[in-house]
């Protein structure tokens, strides 16, 4: 079951023949992901990694039946690639690209409404359902199959959490790296809601960071949902000064509720088990599941 991805998901790669697309497509195939082809305009009709290359996403979908796309396209073209995937009927679009202009993403996100496509990212590590399918840039060997769902703004903290959860003897259903940009396709709350409705996911790890209101929105949803699945939360950027961007474009304290302390307070008030250090994620999730 899990969420978003399963072992039969058919995946295409946009920007397939480029350096990044080639490297990560190879890693995905080795993990067991059903990569069925890719898109590079002007190279349609050729093959790459023993898979067909198409000029357009529409051609790729009509030939392969793909329902998932991962995008390794330069920032100036990435928003168009997202919209092209949605137009072609792709249901899950994962955009890895960092540095997409904000106005481009505002347009792309609005465009996706009503298309039936879900966007993960941009500027994200992707999505992985353990032992089934990996659509992203994460090191697959860290993710062991289990019963914990992960939603995170941070790629590396996703990997850290997954490693700790595995070492605690638990493992994950799916990990969703939602991305660290100000405008992203799937919010923390929307990802948490997916896990709340997934019968295989028994607990959730929610990793946020300074900037924006997504964590507070998710926390209030968790409080009001009536769902008793335990949630462990962590907020990165606890020492960040106001007005200083910390890595991600969206990780900047602009107002009082953007700080790590404010977010952690709201999360605790909403019943989330908040940890002060990422080193405590694994043992805390093990503890709350055992209760």
Predicted regions mapped to residue ranges:
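Catalytic-core regions of core metabolic enzymes
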Residues: 1-291
